[in-house]
Design a protein with these regions (language model features):
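Short glycine-rich anion-binding loops that position phosphate/pyrophosphate groups of nucleotides
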Residues: 5-6, 30-33, 101, 164-165
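Hydrophobic/aromatic ligand-binding patch that stacks against planar heteroaromatic rings
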Residues: 47-51
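Glycine-rich phosphate/pyrophosphate-binding loops
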Residues: 52-74
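Electrostatically charged, flexible surface regions
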Residues: 73-210
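A cross-family phosphate/adenosyl-ligand binding-site feature
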Residues: 1-14
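Glycine-rich phosphate-binding loop signature in dinucleotide/nucleotide-binding domains
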Residues: 17-22
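Glycine/threonine-rich flexible loop motifs
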Residues: 33-42
Length: 210
């Protein structure tokens, strides 16, 4: 069945729009890697995260661009990745990135952390009276050796478990002490609703840190 819509909207299938909801979703194979926190802008990853929001596990698959494209290499890694996905809890999302290498030998699969940025960054290439040129450029930043971007560049296939949108309490935000004090000052007069073990909601306020 063919649908003409953005990738995330196609996840209406998870609601039974085209019959019984799927057991799992495979999004991709995308031409070009989706690594690091830049996956926020990926339609391939976005579709997988949307499926997870409906309680359906999903695998997002991307491969480096090459000539020729190494689609068979990516396909060979999809099956074992789906096996891992199906063994995980419902709503799990795995992000698989495949290097542009021949099928034989099959690249080693590594669990990886998300890189701070990604393989490329978006930049403004130029502006004119009625137009704007956007470009993809190298980040120029030293990579974390355990990150998905770094391992992919070394020829490994990478898998990362990711989550969609989640709320974070102010105390849990990864900020400096000064930033957290500023945030607490902003939220000082707002009640925080935290359900306890018994399901009851307790109201509390945020006190300044020393």
């Amino acid at each position: 069945m063919e649908t003409r819509t953005v990738k995330a909207s196609a996840m209406a299938a998870c609601l039974g729009a085209f019959g019984r909801p799927p057991d799992a979703v495979l999004s991709g194979i995308n031409s070009g890697p989706n690594t690091g926190h830049a996956i926020l802008h990926s339609g391939t990853v976005g579709a997988a995260l949307t499926a997870a929001s409906f309680g359906v596990s999903a695998l997002a698959v991307s491969i480096e661009v090459s000539d020729p494209m190494r689609w068979t290499t990516a396909c060979a890694l999809v099956e074992p990745s789906l096996d891992r996905l199906c063994a995980a809890p419902a709503g799990t999302v795995l992000n698989l990135n495949v290097p542009a290498v021949p099928l034989d030998p099959l690249p080693e699969l590594r669990w990886a952390r998300l890189d701070r940025f990604g393989s490329v960054r978006v930049a403004v290439g130029g502006t004119w009276e009625e137009s704007l040129q956007m470009e993809y450029r190298s980040t120029g930043i030293e990579l974390d050796p355990d990150s998905d971007t770094a391992l992919l560049e070394q020829g490994f296939a990478t898998v990362t478990a990711i989550e969609g949108i989640a709320e974070v309490a102010p105390d849990e935000l990864p900020r400096s002490g000064a930033d957290r004090r500023k945030l607490r000052a902003v939220l000082r007069h707002l009640p925080g609703n935290t359900p306890g073990d018994d399901g009851r909601v307790e109201t509390h306020s945020f006190a300044d840190e020393p």
